[in-house]
Amino acid sequence: MANGRTHTKIAGTADYDDPAFWDTKFATGQDVGEWLNPGENIVQAALSDLENRSFGPERSPRVLHLGPGISKLGTKLREAFVDRDWKGSGIVNVDFSSEAIRLGQEIESEQDPSHAMHWLRADLRAWNDMSSLAPFAPFDIILDKSTSDAIATSPSAPFSPTSISHDTCPVLRDIVDTQGEITVSPVELLALHLVPLTTEGTMWIALSYSTMRFDNLPRLAKYWDIVSRTSLKAPQGQVSSFAHTPEVFHWLYTLRRK
């Protein structure tokens, strides 16, 4: 993966899709760490699903945390794993910021190896990077706290039979083989990249500011069902105190792998 932007920036958007942007924010302490809210709802949704499955000493849950940055969400989940005698090492944090990975690995180096989370650098839009997660797959849960929102600021990607290579996701390769030249939105591309890393029943739990983050994406819908979409009132610090300001809501999505 390149260290900086590899495509044209969409006018009017922040550099959310540029790893160098995040490296600077994390290294200089400019990022607050928790986007939208601290993520307790995501943790509870993940635990509720996992507790309805069968796990034991030989098979702890496997969780893929997308774009954690410096969030404490993974740490909260790991603590819940330890309380349930699940191995925290089943949690894999993946981010395209080298600084986020460095900070995460530094913290985990102090943990017991069986409970130390993995931190891996990868661009979620690049299958050459995502395929490196295969040794940890299949994942039972995907955690996504506004990462899809950030990815959505990227431009759509064109694919054609002549552009397909061994670095192309096999799911995407099959689509191009059938349909020919296509253009894939960034969130749809992420959804397709997650397919080979998951199995039927895998849950993708995503917190977003958008009321329609996963809507009208037919290629996503082929592999993922939107099971629920729950409104969550935004924390007070993110809304104006002016009396007539409307309430602001975030959205907790649950998608199930078909």
Residue map of PLM features:
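Conserved Class I SAM-dependent methyltransferase catalytic core
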Residues: 200-221
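Class I S-adenosyl-L-methionine
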Residues: 215-258
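N-terminal, positively charged/glycine-rich alpha-helical extensions of SAM-dependent methyltransferases
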Residues: 1-41, 45
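Conserved alpha-helix/loop element of class I SAM-dependent methyltransferases that forms part
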Residues: 34-60, 76, 80
